[in-house]
Amino acid sequence: EALGLAKKAYLPSVDLYFQWNRATRNNTFGLVFPGAGLPSISGPVVDAASTQGTFGSVAAALVRWEALDFGVRSAGVREAEALRRRAAAGTRWTEIEVSLGTTDAFLGVAAADSAVRAAAAAVNRMDVFTETISALVASELRPGADLSLARAELARARSELIRSEALRERARVDLAEWLGRAGERVEIEATELLESSPATEGAPPNAAVPHPLAELGEAERDAARARRDVAKGAYLPKLDVLGAVYGRGTGAALDGSFEGGAEGLWPERTNWAVGLAVRFPLLDFASRQETKVREHLEEAAEARYEHAVERVASELGRARLHLDSARRIAENTPAELEAARALQVQARARYDAGLAAILEVAEAERILRRAETEDAIARLDVWRARFEVAAAEGDVSPALSELQ
């Protein structure tokens, strides 16, 4: 709408004017400065003044077109276009932020689910182990201290499960808020996500579409330049083309008599006129100072644009580094998990054979639970890093398509 309004400045203005009045016709010689609301009168001076009134009417069509403005209107159009691009870029960036926030909240719930499953598995293993030790202690095959330590580890595992469940509920609340469903309970199914990973080489970004942050900076710079040009043209001459067609009617005659009746209600005398007018604000020093201010604002906008370009490049570099490290960690955690599972089995076997203390079993259980959690989180972190790269590239559509 603002762009269309700016373009309409090129069109001529056409005003229609109608007036009816009833007034006296007394006139005199002399000059009076025009004042607001002070009526004017035309016609010869008649010696005999009269208080009698008569009808008068005016009908006119007035045309004015600014033929030359030294680029002021074109600068206004450029400013409106830049503001339109800024609004569009702001909308795109908001959409990216919402998509990234929603995805991050979803992955947070998935990670919390994985942590809950790992904690629940640890509780089950320690529960079974504690029952076994209880039987051994009852048979006086193990010291009572082992049972106390096993129960302490079981209680610690249950506390970890409670904390994990609380974190999962908080993550669900965050996801519901991003989805616009605050107050509702949100359930997700992330099994397929945990079993997959994004493509090694994601779909290339659309090079024809700039990053919205860079486009925002560019649009603000262009708008500042346009405002500078508008300020420059404010104190330059303006050339107007003028035209008018108008008619007047009156019930007063040249000799001072009155025709009476309805005479004067209809315009009887018509005229036309065309002309050129030049306007030059000779002493408009404020506009010249405004130009200097606009030039400084343009320099500031240019600096912000360059900073935005650098920021986009830096964010993309950091996101790609995150994705690379996340992939390598996800490739390493399965080996860590396999070793932790083997350690847990071996520690349990050594304890059952009387070759290891219960502390070794407890430590193996903690290592296994941590490895199970880290393995799931590592795979989810690859997806999180993939979306960070997509956001840094300015288009999350390719990353979203990989989820489908």
Give residue spans per PLM region.
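Short flexible linkers and secondary-structure junctions
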Residues: E1-G108, K238-L239, G243, A286-S287
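Bacterial Sec-pathway N-terminal export signals of envelope proteins
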Residues: E1-W20, R25-T28, E66-A67, A75, ...
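Sec/SRP-type N-terminal targeting helices
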Residues: K7-K8, G53-G56, A67-E95, L149, ...
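Coiled-coil heptad-register positions
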Residues: K7-Y10, V14, E95, T102, ...
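Small/polar, glycine/serine/threonine/aspartate-rich low-complexity segments that form flexible
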Residues: Y17-L62, E192-S197, D229, L242-F280, ...
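Acidic, low-complexity, intrinsically disordered peripheral segments
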Residues: R22-T24, E365, E372-Q404
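Periplasmic alpha-helical coiled-coil/stalk elements that build and connect Gram-negative outer-membrane
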Residues: E95-P210, H322, A326, A349, ...
